């Protein structure tokens, strides 16, 4: 189906919302459903016009040939909304297709964050990495290559993600979470180099250096390419952020540490984290 085509009504319409990490979860969920039951798919993008943080449609950068619509483009009389909050367990694509057919539903609108490993395949991970890699352009390639070289030359590169600006509602990781995590890593790995990715780089550099760690503040001005840099590190200390969750997931990480609780306002899926990741309790305030 051609991009932005409205000639064919999609059978599945996934609401895109949130930042890069959330949208990657939504993309994987959409592909899981559409491929599992052979239904036409579109992404609904109404929410970005009102996003309080000015977040953009990232999926369109990664999947330029996908279909992106506003809800007004759908025949609302034949639509049904299915919210993640009413589901128990995973959504089976075959059962969903049967439900649409039996109830005469033209388009099923799916709303949620779908943060679950069971919706993500290794093929999708490879595809996301390739799509991000293909985005490199002249404006960002020099900085990207400089940081990539430093990361690849490091025997045990550590990506540390410190996120603060828009996370006061969900809870912010304590400084001691990062310090304890890095001390644990230093006790288990030799020849480490710390690469810090942060929306407050000066703050992050200051408290980590005061704790005795030498750091490299890292970033090339493009959040998607920074995600690729995080993915090229071998060890990860992530924030309670789906952005750095994906940085670790896209990597061949030998050690990933994440904060617990993940959020002060909601409980994550019990199948959101790989079993070989290490949780640090009491990490979020």
PLM region descriptions:
Residues 10, 48-184, 188-189:
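Secretory-pathway luminal glycosyltransferase catalytic domains
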Residues 37-50:
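A short beta-strand-loop structural module common to alpha/beta enzyme folds
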Residues 42-45, 161-163, 193-198:
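Short beta-strand segments
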């Amino acid at each position: 189906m051609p991009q932005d085509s409205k000639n064919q009504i999609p059978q599945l319409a996934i609401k895109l919302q949130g930042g890069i990490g959330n949208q990657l979860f939504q993309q994987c969920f959409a592909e899981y459903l559409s491929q599992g039951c052979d239904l036409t798919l579109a992404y609904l993008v109404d929410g970005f016009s009102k996003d309080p943080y000015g977040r953009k449609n990232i999926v369109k950068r990664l999947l330029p040939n996908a279909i992106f619509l506003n809800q007004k483009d759908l025949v609302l009389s034949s639509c049904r909304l299915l919210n993640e909050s009413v589901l128990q367990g995973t959504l089976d694509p075959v059962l969903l297709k049967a439900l649409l057919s039996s109830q005469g539903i033209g388009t099923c609108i799916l709303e949620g964050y779908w943060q679950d490993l069971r919706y993500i395949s290794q093929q999708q991970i490879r595809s996301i990495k390739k799509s991000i890699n293909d985005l490199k352009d002249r404006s960002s390639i020099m900085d990207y290559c400089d940081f990539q070289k430093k990361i690849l030359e490091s025997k045990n590169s550590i990506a540390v993600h410190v996120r603060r600006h828009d996370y006061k509602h969900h809870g912010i990781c304590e400084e001691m979470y990062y310090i304890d995590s890095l001390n644990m890593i230093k006790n288990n790995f030799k020849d480490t180099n710390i690469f810090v990715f942060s929306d407050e780089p000066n703050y992050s550099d200051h408290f980590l250096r005061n704790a005795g760690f030498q750091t490299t503040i890292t970033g090339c001005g493009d959040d998607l390419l920074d995600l690729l840099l995080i993915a090229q590190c071998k060890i990860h200390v992530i924030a309670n952020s789906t952005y750095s969750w994906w940085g670790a997931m896209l990597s061949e990480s030998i050690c990933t540490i994440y904060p617990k609780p993940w959020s002060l306002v909601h409980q994550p899926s019990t199948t959101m984290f790989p079993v070989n990741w290490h949780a640090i309790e009491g990490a979020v305030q």
